[in-house]
Amino acid sequence: MQHLSILLVVLGSSIAFAQHDPHFADGRNTIVHLFGWKWGDIASECENWLRKKGFAGVQISPPSENPIVSGRPWWENYQPVSYDLKNRNGDEDSLSDMIKRCNNVGVRIYADLVVNHMATSIGQGTADHSYDPGSKSYPAVPYSNENFHASCDIDYNDAASIRNCELSGLKDLDQSQDYVRGKIVDYMNHLVSLGVAGFRVDAAKHMWPADLAAIFGSVNDLNTDFFPSGSRAYIYQEVIDTGSDPIDNKDYTGFGSVCEFKYGIQLATCFRGSNPLKYLENWGTGWGLLDGGNTLVFIDNHDTERSSGSYLNYKESRAYKAANAFMLAHPYDGITKIMSSYDFSDNDQSPPSDGDNILSPGFKEDGTCTNGWICQHRWSPIFNMVEFRSVVSGIELTNWWSGGDYQIAFSRGTKGTIAISINDSLDSDVPTGLPDGTYCDVISGSLSNGSCTGKSITVSGGKAHISIASDDREAAVAIHANAKL
């Protein structure tokens, strides 16, 4: 019996460790959140853009049935009515087709998993199912009143209340029940069978770690049509822990990664100029971040860009692009995620639509988006830095340099160098490990047909002369081995 217990512990540990692996194809990095996109449009984007630019994966909107809410706010997606795969983003056939097409070009799909709660908005479901939040009846699953925690308001100073009471009035499932666990596992297995590589777990902070560990440990291995035998779903969990919360994000790292919310908060203070950039020399655990092997990191997400002034977003374009460039250049080894937004003036605003139907993005000649889509993943300072991250992968940070509080530069060995200046102008020689020669700055432009579409940077004697004016469109310059003329 003792040998059996040891075996179970070892097997459990192996599964938990495997759930930190995002299953990126070789030479790729970074997940992009194509927030609100239709499944068919994501499939095309995988084939026509993401595969060419080195992106590793896409986080998609929750695929489950949700209420049809007046005005079609984005958050209706986060109120499950059932686990049927039909909503504004598409149906099961289009979802399955998208997952297959993206996998076929080396781009992985991560589903946003909403299993903390069920819908509280009244209406009809997008798969035409009826339900009654008042009596906690969701017959298409089915769930009934006995499958939920008693209704109560959350006290955010109390961990049990956070996990057992209702988030914004949403009906709180009791994941300690075998029946509820089984329904969630069935839903996850359905998505695994279609070929997803993993899950972003919404509101994980509001569920007990032991319950999530049991659920994730019961999910099938990934589909062998796309992944090696025995592969486990990558799990990254929304556990908001800014340092003063009663819930510790480390409690969730035994069975998956966590979204490191402190990452974007801390960088926002630096790139807005309220905390000197020069202090980023020890960026990482020295700033209170978790070890990178347990984290997914980002500058903003779909919630923070709407609800929190503590984070940068696309509306602060210069600082935002520089912060994303820093994230993609730095060796902190959390999985990086880029936000791809649509323009909004109202925090509840629907994705671009003609009413009920989401509009597809259009594209300008330079590759940027139209039809109300922001598409940060198509901005050259961002997609070029995804390539930078691949070029310098596995190489330590060297040649840290600061020319004042808000001017920094560093290298990644002999493969890449980035310089950043906010507030003041920079006009200095900075050390770089790159071989002598002329390089294209991949922030202001690209290397195209043997010439630079943006700035050219000359490296001589191990140094590069960097000029960034305070009114330049971009606050950063980056060069790497693959951008040499």
From Swiss-Prot:
Enzyme class per UniProt = hydrolase
Positions marked as site (Transition state stabilizer): D303
The record's GO molecular-function terms, alphabetically, read: alpha-amylase activity; calcium ion binding; chloride ion binding
Please list the cofactors this protein needs: Ca(2+); chloride
Annotated keywords: Calcium, Carbohydrate metabolism, Chloride, Disulfide bond, Glycoprotein, Glycosidase, Hydrolase, Metal-binding, Pyrrolidone carboxylic acid, Signal
Q: Which residues carry this modification: Pyrrolidone carboxylic acid?
A: Q19
Indicate which residues the UniProt annotation says bind Ca(2+). N116, R163, D172, H206
**Active site (UniProt):** D202 (nucleophile), E238 (proton donor)
Span of the secretion signal? 1-18
Q: Where does chloride bind?
A: R200, N301
Q: Name one Pfam family in it.
A: Alpha-amylase_C
Xref: Gene3D superfamilies: Glycosidases (3.20.20.80), Golgi alpha-mannosidase II (2.60.40.1180)
> For this protein, what is the EC number?
3.2.1.1
Query: What does the cofactor field's note say?
Result: Binds 1 Ca(2+) ion per subunit.
Q: Describe the practical uses of this protein.
A: A possible target of coffee bean insect pest control. This important digestive enzyme could be for example knocked down using the RNAi method.
PANTHER family, per this entry? ALPHA-AMYLASE (PTHR43447)
Name under which the protein is recorded:
Alpha-amylase
Which species is this UniProt entry from?
Hypothenemus hampei
